[in-house]
Swiss-Prot record:
Belongs to the ABC transporter superfamily. Sulfate/tungstate importer (TC 3.A.1.6) family. It is found in: Cell inner membrane. Keywords: ATP-binding, Cell inner membrane, Cell membrane, Membrane, Nucleotide-binding, Sulfate transport, Translocase, Transport. This is Sulfate/thiosulfate import ATP-binding protein CysA. Pfam families: ABC_tran, CysA_C_terminal, TOBE_3. It catalyses: sulfate(out) + ATP + H2O = sulfate(in) + ADP + phosphate + H(+); thiosulfate(out) + ATP + H2O = thiosulfate(in) + ADP + phosphate + H(+).
Length: 372
């Protein structure tokens, strides 16, 4: 089932949860709604499900206006963060519940229900737990049972509201890989809400980044990470360094002067004729680093702290011309080979930068990093 959200607005008192949001979700696609708490992603999910009503705008399901359609008529399966399993029912009865409460004319026979539940438990690889009760299961097992229960009624749309948020990191990683494989088998149009950037980038076909009730960017995981459309997206998806400077137009293109260093601005960046001050965004792994030598090109820094985190060394550097901190990530082998020591003077050179106008870049990136 395809879904179209057209100019949807939702307010709670004076708070605008969704502000004229328009989106299109293609049939059979797994889409992540990503953003900080309060950005409107869960509200949007609930409006699509029919659990909330928009103050303005339209929801189209397969091209038909479903704005006034009851939740039971939308053929939606919903999975919440906190399982919502019935503790007094076995795993089997929990999965069968949606089938048993259907109107008599639509209710399958007992034999059909048993066959359907058995097939679903095999699909989620938990058929051996059919006679157990929810308190006897792990968190990951309970969430898979909740998903099987949602699938039992054969929804045309599957909505997941932070389904792995209550689980520990290792179980979450295992379950999101499992969800991706399950989706590839079923091809049900699926939307899942998350504030976990890694989860969204790993699982989804498409990512919708939201902030303050509006859509910042829609695209593939690769597109939103490598070509962020706004400073907020850049700051929310992973760590980022900000280099404030003065723009200058030249024959070979624009240049951003950061202290005594000139950084080339990639084509398509901020127009130097329209903006004087700008900010360059650079990710920690996109910075070259070497020991300082007279005449060396780059931004002089002092190594303040080095942390080794598995296969990566995280360096905290302080610019010598200001108190600004620069973060650099290096493969652990390169860090050890260079033999860098705390207190040493070094030079950094950004390899890949994205430039935004001064006010736009600083304000939105700071908000994104605080939210992340």
């Amino acid at each position: 089932m395809s879904i179209q959200v057209q100019h949807v607005t939702k307010r709670f008192g004076n708070f605008v949860a969704l502000d004229d949001v328009s989106l299109a979700f293609r049939q059979g696609e797994l889409t992540a709604l990503l953003g900080p708490s309060g950005c409107g992603k869960t509200t949007l999910l609930r409006i699509i499900a029919g659990l909330e009503h928009a103050d303005a705008g339209t929801i189209l399901l397969n091209g038909e206006d479903a704005s006034d359609r009851h939740v039971r008529e939308r053929q939606v399966g919903f999975v919440f963060q906190h399982y919502a399993l019935f503790k007094h029912m076995t795993v089997f009865e929990n999965v069968a519940f949606g089938l048993r409460v259907k109107p008599r004319a639509q209710r399958p026979s007992e034999a059909q229900i048993r066959a359907k539940v058995k097939a679903l438990l095999e699909l989620v690889q938990l058929d051996w737990l059919a006679e157990r009760y929810p308190p006897q299961l792990s968190g990951g097992q309970r969430q898979r049972i909740a998903l099987a229960r949602a699938l039992a009624v054969e929804p045309r749309v599957l909505l997941l509201d932070e389904p792995f948020g209550a689980l520990d990191a290792k179980v979450r990683k295992e379950l999101r890989r499992w969800l991706r494989r399950l989706h590839d088998d079923l091809h049900v149009t699926s939307l899942f809400v998350t504030h976990d950037q890694e989860e969204a980038l790993e699982v989804a076909d498409s990512v919708v980044l939201m902030n303050r009730g509006q859509v910042e960017q829609v695209g593939s995981p690769d597109a939103v990470y490598n070509t962020p459309a706004t400073p907020f997206v850049y700051g929310f998806l992973g760590n980022v360094n900000l280099f404030h400077g003065r723009l200058e137009a030249g024959e070979g293109g624009s240049v951003l002067h950061v202290g005594e260093t000139a950084l080339s601005v990639p084509p398509g960046g901020v127009d130097a004729s329209r903006a004087d001050q700008a900010v360059a965004f650079v990710r920690p792994h996109e910075i070259d680093l070497e020991r300082y030598a007279p005449g060396a090109e780059g931004i002089p820094v002092t190594l303040r702290r080095a942390l080794t985190l598995g296969a990566v060394a995280q360096l905290e550097l302080e610019r010598t011309d200001s108190d600004d901190i620069i973060e650099v990530s290096l493969p652990i082998e390169r860090f050890r080979a260079q033999g860098l020591r705390e207190g040493e003077t070094l030079v950094v050179r950004p390899r890949a930068i994205r430039v935004f106008a001064q006010g736009q870049g600083s304000e939105h990136a700071a908000a994104a990093q605080a939210a992340a």
